[in-house]
Amino acid sequence: MKFVSTFEITKGFDRWLHLVDVELKEKLEKYGVKVHFACANDDETRVYDMSEIDDQSLVEAFMADEEVIKLRTEAGVNLSSAEVLSTVDKFKIW
């Protein structure tokens, strides 16, 4: 399942990128999550991303994983602001 989501961040986009590229790498692999695209607004307080999870039944487990929660919070993600904007069937990245 591919989806577009958004959430608030408080420590900037580079800090969030480090979270995804380094700190969450093992957890993303464990739960089959891939981030295909991400961008931030001008003041780097909100991220918009397109991600994919291999097994939709693992979404809740990933979001409830205590280490994932801890790492995301430490990286400045406002967990309560997360919103799935839409699922995605087709896409192209140039």
Label the predicted regions.
Residues 1-69, 75-94:
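Short S/T/G/P-rich N-terminal loop/turn motif that feeds into the first structured element of a domain
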